[in-house]
Amino acid sequence: MDLSIVIPVYNEVESIQELTEWIVRVCTMNKLSYEIILVDDGSSDGSWERIISMAGNNNCVKGCRFRRNYGKAAAIHTGFGEASGEVVITMDSDLQDSPDEIPELYKMIITDGYDLVSGWKKKRYDPFIKRITSKFYNGTARWASGIKLHDFNCGLKAYRLEVVKSIEVFGEMHRYIPMLAKEAGFRRIGEKIVEHHARKYGVTKYGLDRFVKGYLDLLTVGFITRFGKSPMHLFGSLGTLMFLIGFSMAGYLGVRKLVFVAHHLKAPLVTSSPFFFIGLTVMIIGSLLFLTGFLGELINRNSSERNSYLIREKVNI
């Protein structure tokens, strides 16, 4: 199979049929074999019933329904698990991403040899606040990752199948899939300017809470890519350093006390110096950081599968 197209769906009953028909038309015209995987992320507006109806008319349309809303990353991860096409393409379900971009994205993976191609919505039709926060966040993500993409959060991306089977997407980390792919060893990452449409139906799901969550997940993915396999490398090093600093401060006060005593001088109480309590506090914090790293190692080595979602039903899968 040439293509697997993964589409997270959350209360987009007005748009998903139009989007699906558009994708079918593009794939048919370009002689691409395909499957369309629609993951219903707990919709309550009849989106699932629409998916069932479309799947009944076309076996290439497949659906998966969560029991509740888990978020976009969960839907993408589940879609990746079901995908079997040589190239996997993700896009949003609100008709703001154009299926007409599919053939060129497919070509960039198959012919040009990219592992991942990210869309760049150079001309956007989003609310002003979303455009501003997006520029700020993309600049930070570029600086943190070293990946020269202009639009990390663009929903329209293409992947080699091996890429999506090698990464784990959770939280709000769908924004940072290029970073996860790079860390997994897939370094041929390209970018394509794509057409962006104004929202045709419904209202945007974007809010400032997603902006905050996105930044927190940027910190998370940065930590995971560097220390996820061995948190002791970070916490153990910091803990040991802080413990040694605190011990040195307390040790200095102790040695000074002994020198005074050896010279038969009246020595001040060790506990009368604020440095004693500062040193003691730093030692305690260092010990706690070390224990945090140790516990992180235990959890990392014994944790069960983190991406476990309750699936209510499937169709054509």
Question: What would you call each of these model-derived segments?
Answer:
Residues 12-27:
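Short, well-formed alpha-helical segments that are part of the catalytic scaffolds
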Residues 14-18, 45-54:
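Acidic helix N-cap motif at the loop->helix transition within catalytic regions
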Residues 20, 32-43, 64-65:
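Short beta-strand/loop segment that forms part of the nucleotide-sugar
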Residues 60-68, 72-82, 87, 96-176, ...:
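Acceptor/aglycone-binding surface of glycosyltransferases and processive sugar-polymer synthases
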Residues 179-317:
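Hydrophobic helical membrane-anchoring modules
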